[in-house]
Amino acid sequence: MLLLELKKINQTLETIHFIGIGGVGMSGIAEILHNLGYKVQGSDLVENYNTKRLESYGIKIFLGHVPQNITNVSYVVISSAINPDNPEIQEALERKIPIIRRAEMLAELMRLKCSVAVSGSHGKTTTTSLVACLFEAAGLCPTVINGGIINNRSTNAYLGSSNYLIAEADESDATFIHIPSTIAIITNIDPEHLDYYKDFATLISAFRSFIINLPFYGFAVCCIDHKIVRKLVDDITERKIVTYGIDSADAHIIAFNINTDIASSTFDVKISLPNVLGTTIIEKITIPIPGRHNILNSLAAIAVGIELDFGIKAIKNGFNNFKGVKRRFTKVAEYNMASIIDDYAHHPEEIKATLATAKNIANKQNGKVIAIFQPHRYSRMQHLFDDFMLCFADADILYITDIYAAGENPIEGITGQSLVDKITKNKYHDQANFLATLDDAVGVIIDNAVSGDVIIMMGAGNISSFANELPKKFGNL
């Protein structure tokens, strides 16, 4: 779709239909288009938080995918998660209704603004949210399209009044390299989405294109604590790159004097920008979220703020006003004075970061870490099986459920039980257990939780809904 076409859509008569509108990325774009005045509707298999939110704005939502849903639509938007044999896609093809990919529609929205695109294997959603908070503190009300619910706004997308747009750029299918951004952030690069890229080198090459495609006046912000990102940065001379880290003494922006607890992280920052003489120290920056990985995420936001001259006061105020992101180390309940945390971690690197944060907190409270993990997708487990065996070291007690399929067919030999068996056989963890059902987690918590413990419920499936229902379940005992 050309930019002129987006502008020429008749906002009164022409309807844009989203297939899978309940997805985080799709719902965000639908909301922005609705707020811009376009006529939007969509369908999804089940009702969820996002569909309910969109309905409350007056957007028509169909439950189920049937050809009749697109009877009077002019454009259809799909994501890579939608199968080509979807009946609504087939109907659109039959009727020659233009089918637009989610990333293409995002690109059209970004072309209208000066855009910040946040990508990387992990940390995109939190980083996007932190960047947005700094823009707002600087008096620039940005348009934001995020991959998770921003607690400050109770939504993952909102329309701003300034000429800036901040978006999470999904790297899963390489469409992110076509996003017309002015500022690009790369948090890290791990071997994910290899079902699409086929090999790690191709994925790394896509991130290189993500930077090279920036305009000459733009810049990239990259975490060189991650060795793959460091190598990528070292090989690029065509674009300006600002680096950050905790362990990298040569980074332009470095965090030190770090202290974390269950609710926040405090640290100092040293800034030594390229082509700028001298260094600047910012003392006692506080972010209301724990964890070393979140400090790194905040450094990316600081890099953008410093480059755009937001000022130290705006940076500190922006972080002070940040209320976190749904499902990112979110405390949902307490039992026997033990904290129960809901977290989206579903990749081995994310799990390690989340458990390291939990371990640090539990140690300060003389408690232990109880991890309850629901694997997500058979294909991910198959590709990263060896990494999954090694990522739970910081859990004192580990429970693993069966795999949440997310629409995939089972793969022989790839199960939650097989992961537990291999972990136990190889002595990677001496208290790894298989959890037959999520309901059994209630008994696990009752039997094991004591004061000071941190109970982490992790995964990208329905474990979050279960975790949020725990207060009710405990109340019914």
Swiss-Prot record:
Molecular-function annotations in GO: ATP binding; UDP-N-acetylmuramate-L-alanine ligase activity
Subcellular location: Cytoplasm
GO biological process terms held by the UniProt record: cell division; cell wall organization; peptidoglycan biosynthetic process; regulation of cell shape
EC numbers for this chain: 6.3.2.8
One Gene Ontology CC term in the entry: cytoplasm
Binding site for ATP: 120-126
Entry-linked Pfam families: Mur_ligase, Mur_ligase_C, Mur_ligase_M
Lineage: Bacteria, Pseudomonadati, Pseudomonadota, Alphaproteobacteria, Rickettsiales
Family: Belongs to the MurCDEF family.
Pathway: Cell wall biogenesis; peptidoglycan biosynthesis
Full protein name: UDP-N-acetylmuramate--L-alanine ligase
